[in-house]
């Protein structure tokens, strides 16, 4: 009995690390008129989406200053990458931060938990985290922000990372059962 209990706990604790970014599958095209709401923007999430001719939009509404990070990945299916860019807009649609994927040197990156290869694109963040190779989040003022994901023809798959802090909510066990091989 104790061995089963111990092994179950071990599997749970090992699997929890796989949720560094809480995965969110976006099955529609979030538009400027109907953007996808980013709840708790400091909590690390990965939004998986597919551009099908239109840019995608994500909105953050925060009543307090918060730590901001955004980065873009593209699935690595061959040696050619499809570049993507990020714009961060204020509530008046002015670009306040931009990560131009057409000018970025995209590098292959292996994601060990999902066991997938990606092209690592541009990021909007602070200094580089030497442990991860990704930028750290930075403090941004309270307000409304829109993240725009796009490229020249608005075609392609992407993973948009928002937030840096790891958090495991009440449905973590459900996610572990769903996502653990």
Residue ranges and their predicted role:
Residues 1-6:
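Positively charged n-region of N-terminal signal peptides that target proteins for export
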């Amino acid at each position: 009995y104790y061995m089963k209990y111990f092994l179950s706990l071990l599997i749970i604790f090992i699997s929890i690390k796989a949720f560094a970014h809480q995965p969110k599958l976006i099955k529609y095209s979030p538009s400027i008129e109907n953007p996808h709401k980013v709840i708790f923007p400091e909590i690390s999430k990965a939004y998986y989406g597919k551009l099908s001719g239109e840019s995608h939009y994500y909105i953050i509404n925060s009543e307090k200053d918060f730590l901001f990070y955004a980065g873009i990945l593209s699935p690595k299916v061959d040696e050619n990458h499809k570049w993507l860019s990020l714009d961060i807009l204020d509530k008046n649609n002015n670009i306040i931060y931009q990560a131009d994927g057409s000018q970025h040197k995209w590098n292959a990156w292996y994601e060990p938990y999902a066991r997938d290869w990606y092209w690592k694109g541009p990021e909007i963040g602070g200094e580089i985290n030497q442990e991860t190779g990704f930028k750290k989040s930075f403090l941004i003022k309270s307000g409304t922000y829109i993240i725009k994901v796009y490229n020249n023809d608005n075609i392609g798959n992407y993973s948009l990372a928002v937030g840096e802090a790891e958090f495991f909510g009440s449905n973590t066990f459900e996610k572990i059962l769903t996502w653990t091989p």
